[in-house]
Amino acid sequence: MYKIYCDGATSNNKKNEGIGGCGWVILKDGEKINEGAIHLEGTTNNECELKAMINGYLQLSSMITSLDEVEFYTDSAYIHNCYSQGWWRKWLINGWINSKKQPVANKELWELIIPLFNNKQFSFYKVKGHQGDYWNEYVDKLAVSAKLMKNLKF
């Protein structure tokens, strides 16, 4: 069983002005096998959250087979609600138009994540941020550190 914890962080959540970071950690049977973080500029918190999940998955994808189960953990209501409330299905049916009749934000990132939603190999869980979950706190620190350190990629 693999688990990916992911988190994003920004200071100034405006599209062209936000400075952010994303972080992830990958566990196999409870043991940390990979972690990473990236500094981002001109971003929003939602973009950072999505990029954390995407990068965590990309790191894991070469290690797993189609038989492996993968659980994703995020404190992002944006990601979790998209999955649990089926927003993504409506977006696909409506040509990437949301319930407010506007183009879906972050479409290019969602297009990378949505295929995972429809695969029984992957499960998605919401954790409460800053509530003592060890691995959520860990990736929060990675994301915040990346936000503060320009040119950080590891």
Regions found by a protein language model. Give the residues of each.
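RNase H catalytic domain
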Residues: 9-14, 57-138, 147
